[in-house]
A protein has these predicted regions:
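Short secondary-structure boundary/capping segments
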Residues: 1, 41-42, 120-123
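Active-site substrate-recognition segment that forms the wall
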Residues: 3, 7-65, 77, 81-86
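Conserved flavin/dinucleotide-binding core of flavoenzymes
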Residues: 46-166
Length: 166
């Protein structure tokens, strides 16, 4: 399975996030209306809040000539959508007026359909190619912790390979 998204990353001022959801998933009908899949909130240690708006892709082709306009247009569309979407949470709605955009990016991801990819497939010593991510089976599968753990596991495998080569 593969997906392409436009993500708008926002930095919000200090917000009490105790009563806020960590993720807000939109229904299929709302996704169609707003062009957004979900909102992800990232509380920071200093009480600021990161907010990532996962916008849906419209299929527009990106070229060096079209990229600046596409970035501008998607950032504007996602900013308009998020202001409507956070209305039920007054703390978020109020903080959004002081939000600082960290930019918008288009990204794609491929994911296993039913389970994590076997960790045995993470490193190919013959080709000297390895990869890591949250879609590798194991502790933290499907979460940021899984991506970090798979990176540590890959680093260990590369180190062992390097030692064995010498």
């Amino acid at each position: 399975d593969a997906s392409v998204r436009w993500n708008l990353m926002l930095e919000l001022p200090k917000v009490s996030s105790n009563h806020l959801p960590r993720q807000i998933w939109l229904t299929a009908q709302a996704q169609e209306r707003f062009g957004v899949e979900r909102l992800v909130l990232h509380p920071q240690q200093d009480q600021r809040l990161g907010l990532v708006v996962h916008g849906l892709d419209d299929g527009a082709v990106i070229t060096p000539d079209s990229q600046p306009e596409l970035l501008r247009r998607h950032e504007q569309q996602l900013m308009e959508a998020v202001s409507d979407l956070v209305q039920p949470w007054s703390a978020l709605s109020n903080a959004l007026a002081q939000a600082r955009s960290l930019g918008v990016m288009r990204w794609g991801a491929a994911q296993p359909l039913h389970q994590g990819l076997s960790a045995d497939l993470q490193w190919c010593s013959e080709a000297r190619v390895g990869f890591c991510g949250d879609w590798i089976a194991g502790q933290g599968f499907g979460m940021a912790e899984g991506a970090l753990q798979s990176a540590l596991n890959l680093a260990e495998r590369i180190a062992c390979f390097s030692v064995a080569e010498t």
